[in-house]
Curated annotation (Swiss-Prot):
Start-end of Basic and acidic residues biased regions: 53-64, 313-323
Residues covered by region (Disordered): 1-101, 288-326, 631-693
UniProt remark on domains: The Q motif is unique to and characteristic of the DEAD box family of RNA helicases and controls ATP binding and hydrolysis.
Biological source species: Gibberella zeae (strain ATCC MYA-4620 / CBS 123657 / FGSC 9075 / NRRL 31084 / PH-1) (Wheat head blight fungus)
Domain Helicase ATP-binding: 203-415
Protein name in UniProt: ATP-dependent RNA helicase ROK1
Compositionally biased residues, Acidic residues: 294-312, 681-693
Organism classification: Eukaryota, Fungi, Dikarya, Ascomycota, Pezizomycotina
Gene Ontology CC annotation, any one: nucleolus
Bias (Polar residues): 16-38
Similarity comment: Belongs to the DEAD box helicase family. DDX52/ROK1 subfamily.
Pfam family, one: Helicase_C
Length: 693
């Protein structure tokens, strides 16, 4: 017996700095690929809860015999050895050799929190019903019927070749890239999109495919989920029609940012290796093979306008240089680049893309927001093929976006006089929630100076700080505006010592930089040369950084969806150990409850309660609710307190020091102007040359 342990058992051992000390066994996203990229795998009952009438009652428990501890030991009796033929082990049946029953599909999908729904058409029918008490006509609105589907889930990527007819080249590329276990969104979407007849044998009308909407967490492999069916559909059509190596545009992928476009192109080229397909990103001067359609109305005013415009065109010099036409099989573009090309022809005309059969909207909720909506809808309308399949992918999707998509699909089918395809929705987990495999922290900093101090404490953690696990680089810092990102970069660029790389370890990326500068910064950050990347919401969506250990929201995001996408830059593909830190000041208190609610729901999914939770219940009760008008204003403009005023400046200098620096810079500028003016005056005072004859 240890007498010291016995005497000290009533004391609490202080673990000062033990949480923040470097732990070599601590899991981090930068440590490597997770063995299991799946987020959910719940235990689901395999039998019915209620017993049927014909089912016999369970057998009563049989009492075990009593043990006599003082009985004599029985003598061992020698038994003759019995020869037993060893059974030959039969090969284990693979998932591809048999189809699961509907009950088995339901259990497997439910264990991974997959909900697949067949969205019905919107019906405006209303039923008039008379009330007996008030004797007034009460209108009862008929709700849309939504049928839940239970397709065959994907157990491994090897099933795509055997059970769903995936191309051998694409299957080999998947093996080469290391894809083994599918994530939840891949488990539910790939069978439906690659071979819907095999995934849903009991459903009709699947010969032309389905229109698809997927809502899945960030980092769950949505890019692979829509690239594989698009590539396989093109290869299948080529083999059926025997078109050979003829290239024509058959799939268009629309993404909101250039960085996401380049990432999709890179992943697509890896999957298309050896197939002969071309995946190209659209640029400003890209010209595609398209048909010209006259959009003008037959009116005299339009004819007069055309005549006047044609006269003006005759006066202008004509450009007879032939334009080189790009012929990709899959085009990845931003909405405005494609819209600019489609409307680049003569007035009152528009180009259309009749050969496109797959239209994919990545981050569909932001593409259908007011900022991109007109361009996205015009791109969609330009795809005039009657066999067009449309799919929508995002981690967040509002009900207004879903209804808009449903109405567009219905109106397009009516205008082209075709039968609409089945519209299927896949939801993984809970809608509009952050990934459950990362930690969330809300830190109150009171002011802008407090934010800067808190960020420097994250850069240089001390052993006495026991506020949780430390945030280790590489990590992202999100700000509200470009000016704030630039100012924060100037303030922090010398905080890393020269021995560790100095100012080269910190960079800022935003839409104000050139394409080459943005590509260079992205390349250095992926290579590990840059440790801290300060950016705006331009990197909040879709961009995959596998080894990012954390995210710092220096400014509170403008919406709950914005927080979900920002926090989703870490914890990709099931990696654990990521941290999402959010700073908020006194000016952010009216809006921060949106973020707190998302954190609370995410931690509830992860099973964190009590002290483990990043947001306590008392904080949720104390924070004010965000009004609808404030929520809309915050989403469009952000926090107005960050846009102007002395309090919004990111600087550690005092007001007196800033005034002195501004006065000094003003004096230097004035001195330069006076020197230039003096030089101009001296040039005018030269020798007089007389009057010319």
């Amino acid at each position: 017996m240890d007498i010291l342990k016995l005497l000290s058992r009533g004391t609490k051992k202080t673990q000062k700095g033990s949480q923040n000390a470097f732990n070599p066994q601590q899991k981090l996203p930068s440590a490597g690929t997770s063995t299991n990229p799946q987020l959910y795998h719940d235990q689901v009952r395999g039998h019915k809860r209620k017993r049927t009438k014909n089912e016999s009652e369970p057998e009563a428990k049989v009492d075990l015999p009593e043990v006599d501890f003082f009985a004599p030991k029985p003598e061992p009796v020698a038994e003759a050895p019995v020869e037993v033929d060893e059974p030959v082990q039969a090969p284990k049946p693979t998932r591809s050799s048999r189809l699961l029953s509907e009950d088995e599909c339901r259990q497997l999908l439910r264990s991974h929190r997959l909900k697949i729904t067949l969205l019905s058409k919107t019906e405006d029918q209303s039923k008039v019903k008379k009330s007996k008490k008030k004797k007034k006509a009460a209108v009862e609105v008929k709700k849309d019927s939504k049928k839940q589907l239970f397709p065959q889930p994907l157990d491994s990527f090897g099933e795509l070749r055997n059970a769903y007819g995936l191309s051998d080249k694409v299957a080999d590329n998947l093996v080469f890239q290391g894809y083994r276990v599918p994530t939840e969104v891949q488990m539910g979407s790939l069978p439906l999109l690659v071979h819907p007849q095999a995934a849903l044998k009991d459903e009709d009308g699947l010969d032309g495919g389905v229109d698809f909407l997927a809502i899945a967490p960030t980092g769950s492999g949505k890019t692979i989920s829509f690239l594989i069916p698009a590539i396989n559909n093109i290869l299948r059509r080529r083999s059926e029609e025997n078109t050979g190596n003829i290239h024509e545009l058959e799939a268009v992928i629309v993404a909101p940012t250039r960085e996401l476009v380049h990432q999709i192109v890179s992943e697509g080229q890896k999957l298309c290796k050896g197939t002969g397909l071309k995946v190209v990103s659209m640029k400003k001067h890209t010209h595609l093979s398209a048909d010209q359609v006259d959009m003008a109305e037959d009116s005299s005013e339009d004819e007069e306008d055309k005549e006047s415009e044609s006269e003006d065109d005759d006066k202008k010099p004509s450009d007879d240089k032939p334009k080189q036409i790009t012929t990709p099989d899959i085009l990845v573009t931003t909405p405005f680049l494609l819209f600019k090309f489609l409307t680049s022809g003569p007035p009152s005309t528009q180009k259309v893309l009749p050969t496109v059969r797959d239209l994919i909207l990545d981050e569909a909720d932001v593409l259908l927001d007011p900022l991109f909506r007109d361009a996205t809808m015009a791109d969609w309308t330009a795809c005039t093929n009657t066999n067009l399949r449309v799919s929508f992918w995002s981690a967040t999707m509002g009900s207004n976006i879903e209804s808009m998509v449903t109405e567009k699909l219905t109106s397009r089918a009516q205008s082209l006089d075709i039968t609409p395809k089945p519209f299927v929705r896949l939801v993984v987990g809970l809608k509009d929630t952050a990934v459950p495999n990362i930690a969330h922290k809300l830190i109150y900093t009171a002011s802008e100076q407090g934010k800067l101090l808190a960020l420097r404490q994250l850069l240089h953690p001390t052993a006495s700080d026991d506020s949780g696990p430390p945030l280790r680089p590489p990590f992202l810092v999100f700000t509200q505006t470009i000016d704030r990102a630039t100012a924060l970069h100037e303030e922090l660029q010398y905080d890393i010592p020269l021995e560790a790389g100095g100012a080269a370890r910190i960079a800022a990326l935003h839409s104000g930089l050139t394409d080459s500068a943005r590509s260079s910064i992205m390349r250095k950050f992926r290579a590990g040369d840059i440790w801290i990347l300060i950016t705006t919401d331009v990197l909040a969506r879709g961009v995959d950084f596998a080894g990012v250990n954390g995210v710092v929201n220096y400014d509170v995001p403008g919406s709950s969806a914005g927080y979900v996408h920002r926090a989703g830059r870490t914890g990709r593909a099931g990696r654990e150990g990521g941290i999402a830190v959010t700073f908020y000041t006194k000016e952010d208190i009216p809006f921060v409850k949106m973020v707190a609610n998302v954190i609370a729901v995410s931690e509830k999914q992860a099973g964190k309660t009590g002290d483990e939770a990043g947001v306590q219940k008392w904080l949720l009760d104390a924070l004010p609710n965000v009004r609808k008008a404030d929520r809309k204003k915050l989403k469009e403009r952000g926090n107005e307190a960050r846009r102007s005023g002395v309090k919004s400046k990111i600087s550690s200098k005092s007001g007196y020091e800033r005034r002195r620096e501004n006065n000094r810079l003003g004096a230097i500028e004035g001195s330069k102007k006076r020197k230039l003016q003096a030089n101009d005056d001296s040039g005018d005072d030269g020798e007089w040359g007389g009057i010319d004859d």
